[in-house]
Amino acid sequence: MKRICIAAGGTGGHIYPALALAQSAMEQDPDTRILFIGNADRMEARIVPEAGFDFAALDTHGLEGSLLDKVKAAISLMRAIPKAGAILDEFRPDIVVGFGGYVSAPVLRAAHARHIPVMMHEQNSIAGKANKVTAGCADEIVTCYEKAGEQFPAGKVKLLGNPRGSVAASAAGDRQVLESLGLDPSKKIILVMMGSLGSTTMNDIMQQVLDRPVEGLQFLFVTGRGNEDAGRAFEGRPDVKVVPYVDTLAIYPFISGMICRAGATTIAELTARGIPAILVPSPYVAGNHQFYNASVLKDAGAAQLVEEKTLLENPEVLRDTIRGFFGSPMILESAAKNAARLGKPQAAADMLQDMRILCGGSR
């Protein structure tokens, strides 16, 4: 398995797990050739080359909007199939791995038509549209939740997890980062982070929730770049440190819990490390995926779920949840164990093993 083609695009939830798998493949065999296929005008066109991987672009659009928009999108997807085929013919991959996003659909269809082994990865508990329509092209479908597996042909599904969990599980942390932030490692640290870009709505809510100290807890409040003003209310507070961005891998080993969104990558990292969390799903994502992701952890006793609309009506609900959840050592320990039971820290290695088998190799 020397040549791998990875199709992923649109959002970080598709792209970062794909990059994690690619990096693991290179660690196992530095001579591996990897080609990413994505959209020319989406974030993958910047992120993938910056990570050091080759990138080829297609022009595809999602099936959203008006009827005319959907027709145009369908035409773009059909036109992308022969172009994807030409890219595959030139690169000659041993296997194609699709991580979702509409751009993956024409790539998987082109690979299937050429009898190239295909692995599909579904990050969420509710399958994405692109993966649903191309499931028939896949030889193996990797899921992160049992519920997701129920939406695909049973004989193709394997519950292996998200490669980002492998990255998080192996993170050693950086105590210097902790010290530079002025956090006390002898006290519980709660990371508050609403995705890489932050959330102005949740920033406003957190200012109300943390307007006074919570006994026994200190908070690292990540506002997102461009939202630094949200931290001014906490100037001089030793229990709340505010930054626009933090490398989560550097601080995961030192935190006792998180208050965060419920994107697929975040969930994979939390469970791989056994970090208990209060999850506030983003209500702005397609298919309400984050709510269903969060529900899985809540039902497993690994997290608390609080909806944003509830907090808009009464922010004190979150403060009460913080005190009851993070303030109880017994509840926190139980949630951490339950989160770890859901984790798949070997996801990347397990996927690579199965990829070799699909290519006709052995474990």
Where are these regions (language model features)?
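Donor-nucleotide binding loops and adjacent catalytic segments primarily
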Residues: R42, I47, A51, D174-M258, ...
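Conserved nucleotide-sugar phosphate-binding/catalytic loop shared by glycosyltransferases and other
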Residues: R3-G9, D31-S76, G85, L160-N162, ...
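A short, well-ordered alpha-helix in the C-terminal region of glycosyltransferases
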Residues: I331-P345
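Glycosyltransferases and closely related glycan-assembly transferases
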Residues: M26, K83-V96, S104-M119, K132-E140
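Active-site-proximal region of nucleotide-activated glycan assembly enzymes
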Residues: M43, H112-R175
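C-terminal alpha-helical cap of glycosyltransferases
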Residues: K344-R363
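C-terminal "capping" alpha-helix adjacent to the active site of nucleotide-linked donor transferases
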Residues: Q304-M330
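Acidic donor-binding loop of glycosyltransferase active sites
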Residues: P93-I95, K241, P253-A268, I275-P276
